[in-house]
């Protein structure tokens, strides 16, 4: 099973023998529905009603992204999610209750943030830089307890701890990146080459996480670390966060330090920097490789990174249903 990425302008429609994509040059390509997990549409593509119905019948999500190269703007637009056949009223009730219960919500959010910290260390530790020592000193739970005076401030305190972790991580990254530097994290639009690689890879990771959540009974609109948003499935933001260091930022380090990605792979707009089609293909290739990479952990499991994304979602579901401790994914060999 694979992911389809559509990078060209065109039309997605249902033909006599299945689903097809036709580009602006009238070149027609069949899309084999029996072998795909999801579709990412990364350009201006019209999708017919019959195509959507066919995808809905096969439970195949589509993720849409908007881009304006002149302005240098690119962002997630929305997703088409077929009716969730695994929907559970009980899980929905439990998820809402956990969101409203500040102590439970805090427990989930702290676990995610500590997993972010741990995975940031795993990415940086072989470079022997000071930021690794600083990240190891951070005790997420202790910092939270020492800062908490009122439970209504709990989530903002956790986000502050998370922000400190990411800032240390970014400082460390800039020491090891050979060419393009983050300098500081910028979004919508990303202001430089490193940031645009990160933003693009993060949108892919968000889409994959949403696809995997869709396979569970969880409601993707109800989150714990991120605030609920009308424009995004915020649980996918929560559950992708601790995978960013080991997927997104390893992609950045590899493409930059191996000299794979170059100035010719970027487009500079009025407000920011974007990847051109060839640049996107390089990121997608490395992203797929990271997702399919099998990792054997201390538990003895040898599974793909995509599998661990789904397993984390199921882990959260079990916590909501029967109170088994929620464990966010950590890269523990």
Curated annotation (Swiss-Prot):
InterPro entries from the UniProt entry: CRISPR-assoc_Cas1, CRISPR-assoc_Cas1_C, CRISPR-assoc_Cas1_HMARI/TNEAP, CRISPR-assoc_Cas1_N
Family matches, as Pfam families: Cas_Cas1 (PF01867)
UniProt keyword list: Antiviral defense, DNA-binding, Endonuclease, Hydrolase, Magnesium, Manganese, Metal-binding, Nuclease
GO terms, molecular function: DNA binding; DNA endonuclease activity; metal ion binding
Keyword DNA-binding: yes
Subunit structure: Homodimer, forms a heterotetramer with a Cas2 homodimer.
Role noted for this protein: CRISPR (clustered regularly interspaced short palindromic repeat), is an adaptive immune system that provides protection against mobile genetic elements (viruses, transposable elements and conjugative plasmids). CRISPR clusters contain spacers, sequences complementary to antecedent mobile elements, and target invading nucleic acids. CRISPR clusters are transcribed and processed into CRISPR RNA (crRNA). Acts as a dsDNA endonuclease. Involved in the integration of spacer DNA into the CRISPR cassette.
Listed name of the protein: CRISPR-associated endonuclease Cas1
Organism phylogeny: Archaea, Nanobdellota, Candidatus Nanoarchaeia, Nanoarchaeales, Nanoarchaeaceae
